[in-house]
Amino acid sequence: MEVLAAETISQQERLQAIAEKRRRQAEVENRRRQLEDDRRQLQHLKSKALRERWLLEGTPSSASEGDEDMRKQMQEDEQKARLLEESIARLEKEIEELENADTLPAPVKETQVAPSPGPVVPAPCPAQEDRKAEVDLNAQQTPVGTPKEKRISNTPMRMVEGSTMMNAAMYSVEITVEKDKVTGETRVLSSATVLPREHPPQGIKVYEDETKVVHAVDGTAENGIHPLSSSEVDELIHKADEVTLSEAGSAAAPETRGPSEEVVRTTPSRREITGVQAQPGEATSGPPGIQPGQEPPVTMIFMGYQNVEDEAETQKVLGLQDTITAELVVIEDAAEPKEPAPPNGSAAEPLATEGSREENQVGPEAPASDPQDLDMKKQRCKCCSIM
C-alpha cells in the first residue's frame, strides 16, 4: 500500500511539473509576441523621428507653429521610444529567466519505504519520471513555435536534441541588403548560394530557430544591429528569392542569343548573289530545314469572297477609280511626206520611226496614190491607252 501511495504521489508531482512547464511555455510565448510588437513599434518610431528631423533641418531658421508642433511630436516619440526600449529589455530578461528555469533540474525527493516481507518493488525516481514526462510532452504536446533547442552554437553545425551528435547545415545564402534610413525599408541588392563553411564569418547572430541561423556580417557598427523576428527573416528570404529569379532571367537572355551570333560569324557564304546585301542573322532567322538558296515559304490566309457586278465598284476594289483613259489616233495622208511628232514626243516616236522605215522600204515599189498603200497606212494607225 505504501508503494502505491508513493507511486500516486510521484505521479501527482509529475503532473504538477508538466502543468508548470506548460504555464512557463505559455508565458514565454506571450512575452515573445509582446517583444516582437514592441520592437516593431520602436523601429517605426525611430524611422518617423529620423524623417521629421530631416524635414526640420531643411526648413528655414524662422520658427513657425507647424515647426513647434513637429518638435513637440518628436519629443513625445522619443519618450515613447525610451519606454519601449525599457520594456524590450525587461521582456528579454524575463524570457531568459523563464528559459533558465526550464533547464534547472527538478529537486530529487527521497521516498522512504518500510520493509515488508514480500518482494519490494523499487520506486521510480521522481526526477527521472519528470524528465521522461517532459520529453514525452515535448514530443507530443509542444505548441507550434515553441523553441525546443536551447543550446546556441556559433557554427553552421547544430546539436540534435537528446544527443551529442551535430547536424551540419545543408546550404548557406549570402544576402546583401541596403536599408533606407528615411523610410526604414530594407532592400535586397544581391543574393548568392554558397557552400556551408565550418567556421562562419565574424558577425553578430540576429536570429536562430530550428532550421535557420542568421548572422549580420558587415555594416554592424554603422547601421546598428537588432535581433530579427521570424516574419522579418521570412520576408528577407522572399525578397532574396525574387532577386535571384530576376538575375537568372536576365542572364538567360544573352546566353540564348550567343550561339546564333557565333554561327553567323563562323559560317562562310557559299553563294554570291549580285545586287543583294546579306544581313546578319539571315542564315538562322528562317525555319529549320531551309537552305540558304531557297526562298522561305509564304503563309496565305483566306479572307473570303467578294462579288462585284458594277464596273465602278470593280474599279474601286482594284484601285483604278481615279485613273484617266486617253486615246491617241494618228491618221496619215499621202500628200504629207512626214508624220507630225506628238506634243510630248515620247509615246509615238518609235511608231513614227518604224513607219518611215517601212515607207523607205515600200516606197520605190508602189506609187503613193495606190489604194492598197492607203489601206496599209490606215492599218498602221495605233491607239494607246494611258492609265
Curated annotation (Swiss-Prot):
Residues 22-78, 98-133, 246-297, 334-378 are annotated as: Disordered. The modification Phosphothreonine is found at residues 142, 146, 244. One of its GO terms (biological process) is adenylate cyclase-inhibiting G protein-coupled receptor signaling pathway. The modification Cysteine methyl ester is found at residue 384. Residues 116-125 have a biased composition (Pro residues). Residues 286-297 have a biased composition (Low complexity). Involved in plasma membrane dynamics and cell process formation. Necessary for axonal and dendritic filopodia induction, for dendritic spine maturation and synapse formation in a palmitoylation-dependent manner. This is Paralemmin-1.
